Amino acid sequence: MGCSNSSPSKPPEGLKVNTPSKVLNLDGKLVLLGDSGVGKSSIAMRYVNNVFSESFEVTIGGGYLQQIVRLKDGSSLKLDIWDTGGQERYRALLQLYYRDADAALITYDVTNARSLENCEYWVNELRRTEENCILCLVANKIDVPAEERKIDSKTAQEFVDKFGMIFFETSAKTGENINKVFETVSQEIVKKKNQTA
């Protein structure tokens, strides 16, 4: 029962080993916020596991995922992703999830006009409590037929301009722009952390 100087030359079969090209030197915390049913969990699952399900259960409180994000410069960021429930009765608890967040994806459903209106609450809440948090407005469900869409790009752009946010239109169902959202926000997290280091 001693220590051996030899080490296995490769991991056991079936075991995945994720070796980053550069040492992981940064961690980031990202939170998804928005009304219930806008697709926050679907966005997170599409990004982390590349899956989509029409029958996701409603998130109660919050959920946690983690992803290693490969950046353009070859470095990596360990991103902790907090997926929150959108029910109004849980809003007081959600501060536990977004405390010390580096970034927030404030998400709305393009087929539900009220869901964009309600994003203003989250912007104001984060600016009040997490003033250095990077904010990204995410329009979800852009795969729907045009006649079902209640919020056009121009209206969303006006919202983004008013609050100085990053903006993406996405579809968790098709995967459109999902990776771009996380890659862009991760780059911004790294830039912010490097400026404060």
Spans of model-derived segments:
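TRAFAC-class small GTPase G-domain
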Residues: 1-197
